[in-house]
Structures are given as structure tokens and as C-alpha cells.
A protein has these predicted regions:
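Aromatic-Pro/Gly-enriched surface loop or interdomain linker
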Residues: 32-168, 227, 233, 238-241, ...
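Intrinsic-disorder/low-complexity regions
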Residues: 1, 22-24, 276
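N-terminal Sec-pathway targeting helices
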Residues: 1-16
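Transmembrane alpha-helices
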Residues: 13-19, 97-99
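A glycine-rich, often tryptophan-bearing local segment used as a flexible ligand/cofactor-contacting loop or short
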Residues: 183-263
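Membrane-interface motif at the C-terminal end of an N-terminal transmembrane signal
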Residues: 18-40
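Helical hinge/lid and interdomain linker segments adjacent to catalytic or ligand-binding clefts
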Residues: 136-212
Length: 287
């Protein structure tokens, strides 16, 4: 073998090695923060509209037109702090080492052609698998308003993904706040329920078990929510069963944080009213 042939052969080996490294150890998908997700989702909400709330509100052009026509808005509402009420917000901001878990998997479950199309009979079991969680929607079903309010007040956030990939992350925080984290993995369930100070801001959390495929960023329902038939609470979690009925109280007129063995549980679903209820928000920091 002459010198030139050796160089070509060596170069070929190097190329093959690089190819194998890249394909067998692909670059991890860069994790996106809740703040970045909120900014992306509400990028079209640029029209400020006066209101009687303690927060500024922004709408899309389409929703302003619909509002003027007395039609229901379609694009949610973006909430921001008001420069005129900064002193008020100081009473609502977190005062200890607290983390909130944004339910990105639950958002995916409620998406079009997702789990709920199967539950309603509009789709077969294909709607229970390969459901993408790459573009979460900050809607009522995924605690969209609650997420916004807590985020702008300065609460720290992680997502379901962070907990599933690194369950020990919760050990870094004194208090863990759950939203409508209805669909979780077994690893998530174990890590969350092992924590000593939980605040459940939503009934129906930790209800059904999913499996996550990080190669294509999708989820699949394993069991729970009457799948297969007869399996409602996938984890037989007594706390969820105790508070499940409160899921349908979205006015929270008689709200109360009820003490459980490792924290507190709210007795209503606050996402439709939390932006009106500063007393409830203030109570969170004291638990």
C-alpha cells in the first residue's frame, strides 16, 4: 500500500468514525424554558386592552375584532404586570425556594388529534400514541392563566420534561407546586409524591400514566382515564381520588387549601378565576 492509499484509507476511517459518533450520539435537543414557550405562544398578543383587573391584558388583532362583535375570543389572553401596581405585586411574589412544574405533557394530551379525540369517540387508539409535545398551548386545560400569573410574579418554573429526565431535581426545592399535571410518567409520579412539601393547585393531577419518546418528542398513554376500560386512576393515588370531584369547580368561590400528609391541596380548579383572586395567590407563598 503506497503513501497516498494510506492517506485515503485513514481519511475514510475518520469519516466513518465521525458518522458513527454523530448518529449514535445525536446532539440533545436544546431544552426550552417556560418563559421562552410563553413568549413564543403569545407573540401575536400585542394589543393592550384596559380592564378592571390587577394585571395588564393583551389580545390578538383577531380577538379584538371578535370582542367588538361580542363574540368569544379564540386566542387566549396574555397577562403582564402593570407598572402602576408594583407595590401590590411585592405581596404576591414567592418568598422561599419554590418551583412550579408546567404540565407540558398534559397540554399535548389535550391537543387536536390527541387523547381527548379518542375519549370522545372521534378517533381510534392511534390518537393515544405519537402525540407531539413540542408546541404546548397555554390553555385552560394546561393551567395557562395560572402559569402566566405565577411566571410574571417571579415564580421559578421547570417542565414535566425536566422532572422525567432528572427526578432528583425536585430535591433542590423546599416547595413544589403542581398545576394540572394530569398525565405523568412513573418516574415523575414517584419523584413528586416523595417530596415533603407539595402544593396542588389543581385537582386531577397525577391521574394517568404516559410513556415519553424523546427521539421524536411524543407521548403515549399507557393507562388511566378509563384506558383500558375500568382503569381510572392509573396510580391508585389516594390524594387524587380524594380531590377529583373538585375539578369541576372553576369559580373557586369557597376556595381552601386543605392540608394533606405532605403538603396542601386546593379544593377547586382556579385557572378561570385566579387572575381575579389575589388573596388566593397571596396564600400560596405562605404554605
Amino acid at each position: 500500500m503506497n503513501k497516498f492509499t494510506k492517506i485515503i484509507s485513514f481519511g475514510t476511517v475518520v469519516i466513518i468514525v465521525i458518522f458513527l459518533i454523530v448518529n449514535l450520539n445525536p446532539e440533545p435537543v436544546e431544552e426550552i424554558t417556560v418563559g421562552e414557550l410563553l413568549k413564543k405562544y403569545f407573540s401575536s398578543h400585542v394589543i393592550k386592552k384596559s380592564n378592571n383587573l390587577d394585571f395588564d391584558t393583551y389580545f390578538t388583532k383577531n380577538d379584538i375584532i371578535r370582542h367588538n362583535q361580542k363574540l368569544q375570543i379564540q386566542d387566549e389572553v396574555r397577562f403582564e404586570l402593570s407598572s402602576e401596581k408594583l407595590e401590590l405585586y411585592e405581596k404576591l411574589k414567592p418568598n422561599k425556594n419554590t418551583i412550579v412544574i408546567y404540565p407540558i405533557f398534559t397540554s399535548a394530551a389535550y391537543s387536536d388529534n390527541g387523547f381527548y379525540d379518542y375519549y370522545s369517540g372521534d378517533c381510534d387508539e392511534s390518537c393515544l400514541k405519537d402525540i407531539s409535545f413540542e408546541n404546548p398551548e397555554f390553555t385552560y386545560d394546561s393551567s395557562g392563566i395560572t402559569t402566566q400569573i405565577l411566571h410574571i410574579l417571579g415564580y421559578d418554573f421547570i417542565t414535566d420534561i425536566d422532572v422525567d429526565k432528572n427526578p432528583k431535581i425536585l430535591q433542590n426545592y423546599e416547595t413544589v407546586i403542581l398545576l394540572h399535571n394530569e398525565y405523568v410518567t412513573q418516574k415523575m409520579f414517584d419523584a413528586i409524591t416523595a417530596h415533603t412539601n407539595l402544593i396542588f393547585l389543581s385537582p386531577n393531577a397525577l391521574y394517568a400514566e404516559i410513556e415519553v419518546n424523546y427521539d421524536n418528542n411524543t407521548i403515549e398513554l399507557i393507562h388511566g382515564h378509563d384506558y383500558p376500560p375500568g382503569v381510572s386512576n392509573a396510580f391508585d393515588y389516594e390524594i387524587e381520588e380524594q380531590f377529583h370531584e373538585y375539578e369541576y369547580d372553576n369559580e373557586c368561590l369557597e376556595w381552601e387549601f386543605i392540608e394533606i400528609k405532605n403538603g396542601y391541596h386546593l379544593n377547586c380548579y382556579p385557572d378561570g378565576s385566579i387572575h381575579y383572586n389575589l388573596e388566593l395567590i397571596a396564600k400560596i407563598k405562605d404554605l
